[in-house]
């Protein structure tokens, strides 16, 4: 029996809708995201293989209304279950202080998922036949909106306000026929909604708003250094913290000092790719996100379900890092494939296409499985590093595969340091330097140099760590230990005075310990 034309995409939609909401799987060093990425890649690869089989059987028209409706339905269903789980957690444990997360890692991730899926639910609500289905989709939309509010995500609230404006326009246009009254009610409501949203977003977390402004300013300095070609792959990770350190050296009394932390992303996707790859990258990203709108304006009304979802990614890209999560890439991929479906249909006519598709699918499967095995080996080595010297042999075996991964190198150096293999730790942490300039790397490098009695280098690393994050106490403790070991009483007293008078951001047990020790 020939394969049903829509089967590959229906399989992918069902698979992805479940994978995106997976709880943490503790088989890798990143229990939240890595399992989702691996399962998503495997889902795409298997879909490609199924599509190749469909082509071999002469089934070429994959895109149809049934597939689109199925995609919206399965994502609406899984999102509704996720929202119900959030409700269950609230009933059992009460409201979460930092915002609801459900089965995901943080409120921002949950809000992104809800904002992407809400337009799909709305599309089903508008196009469904039958009162019972409309009630079901309406209930799912209301539940998603309530949970989105409970995430306390400011970007999510902006998207929710956007949905409110669009929904209000649909209601006003349908039920109010007098043009002047219609525009009056709509205009006043929109102004009030926008003013309320702006006030909430601006004043809800003032420290966070100030911190974002500071990060954007330092990131823009990186852009101005190499606006055309950028700083290269992962240039932001290499360069940003150095600029932050330079700023606080020049402005030690800055109001931002108490807010500074380890930064690995500027909280703006356009700025991030610009720093790394130059001006062409943000332009390409913007055009990609606007592709459904361009197709819709050219008369392709079948792009309607993707307009708001891609707009959501555009909004999140201005304030967060949505492409850190599989749901963003999935949304872009489906939107782009649907936008170029006619071109894709022409490619399907070529006999070589299913062979290329099958080879590509098998390659993705092989790559994903190989990477997952190595990542699991890293997880095992990390777990063993707390109690077994054999962990260093495991790290050594994994080193050729991960030698360009700065997170692995830091983990390897930390494991070597904990097992008291200082020479190995020093070599590895130095290899990490050209790939990543960060507070934690400098602090670990300082500790390694201190125990190797390389005191001048230890001072350099501790001072760099202190400049990167002036609010932290650990670098000052490191400097205190160095000056104590070298008998430098003058600098020892200066550091002790700094620790005694330093503003405490979070009064943790470590801070209290450092204050007691360094009196």
Regions found by a protein language model. Name each.
Residues 376, 407-411, 440-445, 473-478, ...:
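Alpha-solenoid helical repeat scaffolds
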Residues 10-29, 36, 40-60, 66-97, ...:
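Alpha-helical transmembrane segments of multi-pass inner-membrane proteins
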Residues 197-211, 359-390, 407:
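Hydrophobic alpha-helical transmembrane segments in integral membrane proteins
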Residues 233-276:
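Interfacial juxtamembrane loops and adjacent helix segments
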Residues 403-404, 436-437, 470, 504:
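Short coil turns that delineate tetratricopeptide repeat
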